[in-house]
Amino acid sequence: GGHSGAEIDKNRANANKLMGLFLYELGQKTAYSIKDLSGGTKDNAITRECEMSLIYADSAEAQKAEKLACDLAEVFADEITSFEPDFSCEIAVTEGQSAMAVQEEDAKAFVSLMRLAPNGIYRRNIKMNGFVVVSSNMGVVRTEEDYIMVAVSPRSSVASLQEDTKSRFALLAETFGFEIEYSGEYPGWSYAEESKIRDLFVESYRDLFGSELRLEAIHAGLECGLFSEAIPGLDAI
């Protein structure tokens, strides 16, 4: 879990992305239908939990899936134990009557989208100690009675790179038959290697407190991006 801006560099596991891989791998060896799936609460939060219910036609196939699921959980735990020591996966098989499920073609497209959608960091600034420049976070995934929703939060301090990320998701949506909507957008705020106001701020801090100010760039949306877009040439820190 954590904030997808401030903590995306911690290499935290995203439960929605793990579920996408989980469903993909199960689908290679078993035939299931997706009854429902729900993961995450906010698009800008790294997903901590994701749960789903699958339907199998017979108990033998369900038992096979249970064994595969347990094996996959062990593989995931081994892969992420260094940064997610508290990872857990609960698996239960129950008997019941038939239920409504996501249509087969929609389910395949859904799983493929979850599996292939970019997530995490995909560009850093090596001149700034690996400062994150571009990332995305699959924050919410949910099936409803008549639609499937995937909410993603892409971030970049560079406008052109943000547009590149958006085009990737637009292409994925088109490929798998999803509609895409944009909301809550705000402009990026590129780091200025030279800043007179920053130099003045550092000098003033030194004079006032007798110590050096710690400067830190963060991969998160700030009002400065809005101000900088509205006032070209603004020197903001």
Model-derived regions, located:
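Short glycine/threonine-rich loop-to-helix capping motif typified by GTGT followed
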Residues: D43-E51, A99-E105, S190-E203, L226-A230
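Generic long, charged, amphipathic alpha-helical segments
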Residues: E174-L208
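C-terminal, non-catalytic macromolecule-binding modules
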Residues: A151-G177
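Glycine- and other small-residue-rich loops at beta-strand/loop junctions that grip anionic moieties
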Residues: I8, S190, E216
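Midchain, well-structured core segments that form catalytic/ion-binding scaffolds
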Residues: G1-P154
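A structural preference for short, hydrophobic beta-strand core positions in alpha/beta folds
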Residues: D36, I91-V93, I180-G184, L215-A217
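Catalytic-loop motifs flanking and including active-site residues across diverse enzymes
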Residues: A15-M19, C50, T165, I197, ...
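Zn-dependent metallopeptidase/amidohydrolase metal-coordination segment
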Residues: N129, V133-D146, S153, V202-I237
